[in-house]
Amino acid sequence: MPCTCGNWRRWIRPLVVLLYIVGLLVVVPLCVWELQKLEVGIHTKAWFIAGIFLLMTIPISLWGILQHLVHYTQPELQKPIIRILWMVPIYSLDSWIALKYPNIAIYVDTCRECYEAYVIYNFMVFLSNYLTNRYPNLVLIIEAKDQQRHLPPLCCCPSWAMGEVLLFRCKLGVLQYTVVRPFTTIIALICELVGVYDEGNFSFDNAWTYLVILNNMSQLFAMYCLVLFYKVLREELNPIQPVGKFLCVKMVVFVSFWQAVLIALLVKVGVISEKHTWEWQSVEAVATGLQDFIICVEMFLAAIAHHYSFSYKPYVQEAEEGSCFDSFLAMWDISDIRADISEQVRNVGRTVLGQPRKMFFAEDHEQNEHTSLLSSSTQDPISDASSMPSSPMGHYQGFGHTVTPLTTPTTVPVVDGIYNTSATRDTEESPELMHNSSEKALDRS
């Protein structure tokens, strides 16, 4: 029998805190014992200091994740948020392990790098799901806007048509990095096994240089598409304060990447040389260790920023339903990713064959993260929800969009804002939007 809101929300947080304290009582003595056993040098001190930052980082991140699971009232918004919040503990833990065991750093760091692409994808999903719920006629709204020109350095390229074309290309631009990064990571592992990777050495005789260039181009284009997407829909996204969220994601991704490039340049020009390896086996190991140490420190600051930027407070409701198991299971559900990739591949195929693409945004109902998220709906959602199968995962519809609530409503409204009568207001505005859209099209022609 699943644990309901009547009990599990009361004991889950104290239980997690207790488990973390027990973990500290086990891990801290082991780290101190390891520090006393080894010769205390730069490498050992760096590993121990990084461990202190790790122990401060993880509880901040886990608390935010736990609070979202406890108040899991908006699955289509909170699922990508939880995935983004996992970035900090994954980055921090991977870097600390790689710092301790330099020989396996290449294998541990690959997990961190793949999750980086996953985070960018989920941020796009978060924005898309919010807009889909808030504005059922989003394509018409975009078509009614002035033509958005490309941003530097692509300002000389032809502009993307406002509407479905722009949405499709922005989302495809983000999704391509989710595919490219794991692919290049697998290539990097193979090159390391055959001895041609040579990480941290800028030379066109090794594979690392080419993979860095490819990853950088793919990452920059993904971030460019995110910026262009925000530029077009800035007014519509203002209620969820996307700038702080975007900076949190962008800073972690870009800072970690470019500081690795900077450290590699320091190795190339001889600032980091064989004369000072500080207990590491090689100069490349020094570069990797320095990168891992800096990431452990940075993740503590990132955890604080994520805690405030991706707060759980807008999702707190007085009458919350759902089981502990469903909330936990939904966090690990990746069916939307498979559906997104399949849908984008089909859309690309339709474009190549000259067939019409499937519309991204199906009609939905209004939702707002801060105000209407907590407001009461006057419409009875029971009749609407009865036609939908109950599932904690929801049903995929478009780019990462789920429309089925966590639980089927009984006497209280489902997630506030999803079945909101204000959606009718948006629907009624569609003739005006269509009229404005046609005028914009005539002006552009």
From Swiss-Prot:
Organism: Gallus gallus (Chicken)
Protein name: Transmembrane protein 184C
Membrane topology: Multi-pass membrane protein
SMART domains per UniProt: Solute_trans_a (SM01417)
Cell division in keyword set: no
Its biological purpose: May play a role in cell growth.
Cellular compartment(s): Membrane
Residue ranges of the region described as Disordered: 369-393, 421-445
Any one Gene Ontology cellular component term annotated for this protein: membrane
PANTHER family named among the record's database cross-references: ORGANIC SOLUTE TRANSPORTER-RELATED
Biased composition annotated in UniProt, kind: Polar residues: 370-390
GO molecular function, one term: transmembrane transporter activity
Family according to the record: Belongs to the TMEM184 family.
Transmembrane residue ranges: 15-35, 46-66, 84-104, 177-197, 210-230, 252-272, 285-305
UniProt keyword list: Membrane, Transmembrane, Transmembrane helix
Main location, first listed in the record: membrane
The keyword Transmembrane helix is assigned to this record: yes
